[in-house]
Amino acid sequence: RACCTFSQGCLYNMNSHGRVACLDAATGRELWAVDILERFEGRNITWALSECLLVDGQHLIVTPGGRKALMAALDKRTGQTVWTTAPLGDDQTSHCSPILFRHAGRRLITNCSSAHGFGVDADTGELLWTAPLRNPFGTNISTPIYGDGCVFYVTPYAELGRAYQLRADGQGISAEHVWTSPLDTVTGAGVLVDGTLFAAGYKTSKWWFGVDWRTG
């Protein structure tokens, strides 16, 4: 269900049951595979998994949402665990995919669990911030969007779209809610271009949206 990720002659993919595989792109030969739900004691979600995996240097980023890890970095050459992010309460994984960006001199990764948007340090997996993203179905679908120090999370049916300003605070990063939009895109996320967020509405307003990134 998820797109493959290509890096240095290898393809990486996770199937709908949490099996992550590394394939030789030229031959299709499987080089290694790991069940991340089993390794990190996660449970599959109602409509199964569809995370597009993120390659960061020698790391492959996955979001098992298990009792042993909310997020994890695997060695992309072997599948061995490099770092983990501590679980976030009872949160499971979601249908979203992680993104990597730089803010305040740090490399950061953000994604969504079943009930939160969250951000971690890309080098250590340390959990830095969370933002509530609850809805009656207990899952989130749209991949976060980052731009100009803000990150945008959206969940359908409930809290809609919210932007958070990231602020460096000593050794940490906090996320301050700055605006809310009726935009409730559900499966396609959005695109940020020249200060405008473009995306399609779902239940609340079935329109195309162009949202000012600074004001909402």
Briefly describe each language-model feature range.
Residues 21, 72, 118-119, 162, ...:
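WD40 beta-propeller blade core
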Residues 164-198, 202-205, 209-215:
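Eukaryotic tandem repeat interaction scaffolds
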